[in-house]
Regions:
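Proteins enriched for Cys/Gly/acidic motifs involved in redox and nucleic-acid/cofactor modification
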Residues: 1-205, 244, 255, 259, ...
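Radical SAM enzyme [4Fe-4S]-AdoMet core and its adjacent flexible, acidic
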Residues: 12, 206-223, 227, 273-274, ...
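Conserved SAM/AdoMet-binding glycine-rich loop
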Residues: 76-81, 86, 91, 189-313
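Short, hinge-like loop/turn segments at secondary-structure boundaries
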Residues: 95-96, 117-120, 213-215, 249-250, ...
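Conserved, mostly hydrophobic/aromatic
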Residues: 180, 197, 233, 261, ...
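Contiguous mid-protein beta-loop-alpha structural module that forms a pocket-lining wall or clamp
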Residues: 310, 317, 325-327
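Terminal RNA-binding accessory module
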Residues: 345-442
């Protein structure tokens, strides 16, 4: 009987793509993939180690399955991903119940590692070089069947002072364009209609191997693939958003008019301490240009409150900036000191309660903005991809071009006719909720 393997993948879409490649390798080698990890022989926890809350979630999940192992319900527990890469020695010491701690560079060895564990019952620790970049082979898509993420690069070279990603995943390494297009074509052939392009910094794509950003050319090539209806790009850095990129997004029908652009702050001093560029004036000018070049664009951003040294005045400026710009989508996080980063050693740390309260204030303001934008959407007609049927609410739900999977809101809608999952329908907006919309199929 084939060994049953379950995967629990935590964290960001980039981590999810890694998990899908591992699942494919396991399936190809004869392992049985099970959706309920608690019913497996071997559990892989693909961890996130980005901020404190993510690390705690990963540890809690590992301990949960180690308990099942002690009860005899599963045979082995393996940790992969960012936390395993970052805290390899600590995890081996503090969680001896783990059968393997597998670094990011060794994901391709996962089948051999499982065989070794089951044969010898000896703990395994495996780490490959973080300079390697291999995403060959297929994937087992773990998202809803009609959309998938495609990772166009690994690592990061921006070296923001608050971020540990470069030390975990190495320097930025772009994939060859032909490899990305080949994988995208495979996804389209397997029923994916919405492609979501991801990397730590998508706008840097190609600089390391082609000598310049090739994101516009890559997006153009992806638009030529039959089968995709929507193509969405996440994680664009403001200083690398060029006129060429904006022109491509405006021109290509398959490219949704949606731009995810994490700015983190608007104060020049804070941004400089973060090792980021720009200030309120340059960001305002960029956003004005984006909205002029791409009418009806949906702008998403993320902010950090309580970064070391942030004064009340600088925070108030950030609040005013949010009110002025009126981002369509916004997420805000209280600064989390990360071990080994320069910002962790800054002396002027803001108290946790102040960091968290400032994040709450930003999100309260965004709620007002969201309410206003939703009210303006009343009586409009939008194209919606049906994601499923909400049996509790007795209606369908889906997303529009303005809503990225997993992070943005939903559109709930009634229909006299049966609507299939993955079907794209026209919906008239009749009512609003905090971040969601309610409508009826036309």
């Amino acid at each position: 009987m084939a060994t049953r393997v379950g995967m629990v993948s935590l964290g960001c879409p980039k981590n999810q793509v890694d998990a899908e490649h591992m699942l494919y390798d396991l399936h190809k080698e004869g392992f049985q993939i099970v959706s309920d990890a608690a019913l497996s022989d071997v559990v892989i926890i693909n961890t996130c180690g980005f901020i404190e809350s993510a690390k705690q979630e990963a540890i809690d999940t590992i301990l949960e399955f180690c308990t099942l192992k002690q009860e005899g319900r599963i045979k082995a527990v393996i940790a992969t991903g960012c936390l395993a890469e970052r805290y390899r020695d600590e995890m081996k010491k503090e969680i001896p119940e783990l059968d393997a701690v597998v670094g990011i560079g060794s994901n391709g060895k996962i089948c051999d590692i499982i065989r070794e564990i089951l044969l010898d019952k000896q703990a395994v620790c495996s780490y490959g070089a973080k300079t390697e970049l291999s995403m060959e082979g297929g994937r087992i898509i773990s998202t809803e069947p009609f959309y998938a993420y495609i990772k166009i690069a690994e690592g990061c070279s921006n070296n923001c002072t608050y971020c540990a990603i470069p030390s975990i995943r190495g320097k930025y390494r772009s994939r060859r364009m032909e490899d990305v297009v080949k994988e995208a074509r495979w996804l389209a052939e397997n029923g994916v209609t919405e492609l979501v392009v991801v990397a730590q910094d998508t706008t840097r794509y190609g600089e390391d191997i082609y000598g310049k950003s090739m994101l516009p050319e890559l997006l153009t090539a992806l638009c030529e693939i039959d089968g995709f209806k929507w193509i969405r790009t996440l994680y664009c850095y403001p200083e690398r958003i060029t006129d060429e990129l904006l022109d491509v997004i405006a021109k290509e029908d398959k490219l949704v008019k949606y731009l995810d652009m994490p700015i983190q702050h608007c104060d020049k001093t804070i941004l400089k301490r973060m090792n980021r560029r720009g200030d309120r004036e340059t960001l305002t000018a960029l956003i004005k240009k984006i909205r002029e070049k791409i009418p009806n664009v949906t702008l998403r951003t993320t902010l950090i409150t309580g970064f070391p040294g942030e004064t009340k005045e600088q925070f108030e400026e950030l609040c005013e900036f949010v009110k002025e710009i009126r981002f369509e989508r916004l997420g805000c996080f209280a600064y989390s000191p990360e071990e080994g980063t320069p910002a962790e050693k800054f002396e002027d740390q803001v108290p946790l309660k102040d960091r968290e309260r400032r994040a709450e204030i930003i999100m309260e303001e965004q709620m007002i903005i969201s309410d206003s934008l939703n009210e303006a959407a009343l009586d409009s007609e939008v194209e919606v991809v049906c994601v499923g049927l909400d049996r509790y609410a007795e209606c369908y739900y889906g997303r529009s071009q303005a809503d990225a999977p997993e992070i943005d809101g939903k559109i709930f809608f009634l229909s006299e006719d049966k609507v299939r999952v993955v079907e794209y329908v026209k919906v008239k907006i009749d009512d609003t909720m905090d971040y969601d919309l309610i409508g009826s199929k036309m």
